[in-house]
């Protein structure tokens, strides 16, 4: 297991802030404790879930290896996060269909992953050389999925996408 993320690692918390910061306006629109969230692919240390709980979001966690609780996949959520996990999906269309069920109407799907910029740069891209990275997405891919499945999409950082379900 190569995961080195921990609750005490301020650098990791700052890294996750790239997802948390653009979610803050959405969180502030709701009463403290009323939002329900799911950290999908939380890993062994669900730091983002903890950070969201500090903001008043009631969080559940799911990870096929570290938090394999299928019952949390049977409800819908105001916020679903998927940080540094989607690139590991061997059948991303399956998880995407699940995301469409998990995100409540008006809810937000927040994804963090490096995006493909163009074919030429992909050839020399270090990110694809990680053998566990098997799925890659571009801005155009997320725009297509958003249009097809009823989301408004924004790109608040080079590796963050927010999709708000209409």
Where in this protein do the model-derived segments appear?
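Short, glycine-/aromatic-enriched active-site segment of Class I SAM-dependent methyltransferases
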Residues: 112-135, 140-141, 145
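Short glycine-/acidic-enriched loop or helix-start segments at secondary-structure transitions
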Residues: 48-49, 91-92, 120-122
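A short SAM/SAH-binding and catalytic strip from SAM-dependent methyltransferases
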Residues: 80-92
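Short phosphate-binding/catalytic loops that engage adenosine nucleotides
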Residues: 56-57, 107, 151
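Conserved N-terminal segment of class I S-adenosyl-L-methionine
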Residues: 1-79, 96-97, 129-130, 140, ...
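Active-site micro-motifs of SAM-dependent methyltransferase domains
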Residues: 66, 87, 116
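A short glycine-rich, Lys/Arg-flanked "PGG" loop and its adjoining helix->strand segment in the class I
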Residues: 96-108
